[in-house]
Regions:
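A "functional boundary" signal
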Residues: 25-242
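Bacterial N-terminal signal peptides
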Residues: 11-22
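Generic short amphipathic/hydrophobic targeting helices enriched at N-termini
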Residues: 6-8, 21, 34
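Bacterial N-terminal signal peptides that target proteins for export
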Residues: 1-13
């Protein structure tokens, strides 16, 4: 009875802290054009592509964006053009070849990103499009296989983008499998990675709350409270502009 009462109290406090966080810790976004110094013509055309991301016609539009970016010597926008094709097949209507198309363009952006030293696009499409697609489709063993490959690769190369993405993916997979002991491992890894490399702490409160929730699921109320106490240290931390 006491354990149930404690768990209930912690759950109430989790909700309280979610409400306390301004905007639920959404990062303060800056203009992408200003941040990355994107050519105005490219940026305007990219916005048209984004608006049409679910339309079949966007594939040809993104091919055009890629060629425009190539003419400008903008490798980043070339990567964006390819990566956006994974957005199309991820967000667009379901059809028979959807998964194969998503795999194809995930591999395409991975190849381009590796050749041009842009690991953020390499890992983003892999984790947040292909693996997340598998997770949402309940193909959890496939998702776990890909995420484990990503963990091995990113850790061996010491690529922070990859480690962040794969730890987040593995956390979601184990939560979906209701394997909360394993989920706590990756919730903690995300926190440790942020602190070790002094990464942006704007949503570190969220990470501690998620860790606390995982501990609740394993009936470890003391650890849940400890994580919740740690979360309070980062309430109000805003997104830094780099």
């Amino acid at each position: 009875m006491e354990a149930c009462r404690t768990t209930g109290l912690v759950s109430i406090f989790l909700l309280f802290f979610w409400l306390l966080i301004p905007g639920h810790i959404h990062g303060q976004q800056t203009s992408e054009q200003e941040k990355y110094h994107v050519d105005s013509t490219l940026f305007v055309y990219y916005q048209h592509c984004k608006a049409a991301i679910k339309s079949p016609s966007v594939i040809l539009m993104l091919d055009t964006l890629f060629l425009m970016a190539k003419d400008k010597g903008d490798l980043r926008m070339q990567a964006v053009a390819i990566s956006s094709k994974t957005d199309h097949f991820y967000f667009g209507p379901s059809f028979e070849g959807q998964e194969d198309s998503l795999i194809l363009y995930t591999n395409t952006i991975k190849d381009f990103a590796r050749k041009t030293n842009q690991p953020q696009y390499y890992y983003f499409a892999w984790a947040n499009r292909l693996i997340t697609y598998y997770t949402k489709q309940k193909k959890l063993n496939l998702a776990l296989y890909e995420a484990n490959k990503m963990q091995q690769e990113s850790e061996s190369r010491e690529e922070i983008d990859g480690m962040q993405n794969c730890y987040q993916a593995l956390l979601r997979i184990y939560q979906s499998k209701e394997l909360y002991k394993q989920a706590t491992v990756y919730a903690q890894k995300l926190i440790d990675l942020t602190l070790k490399y002094n990464l942006n702490k704007y949503n570190l409160t969220n990470k501690y709350i998620e860790l606390s929730n995982c501990y609740l699921r394993t009936n470890e109320s003391t650890k849940a409270w400890e994580a919740l106490e740690e979360s309070k240290l980062y309430i109000g931390v805003t997104c830094k502009v780099t």
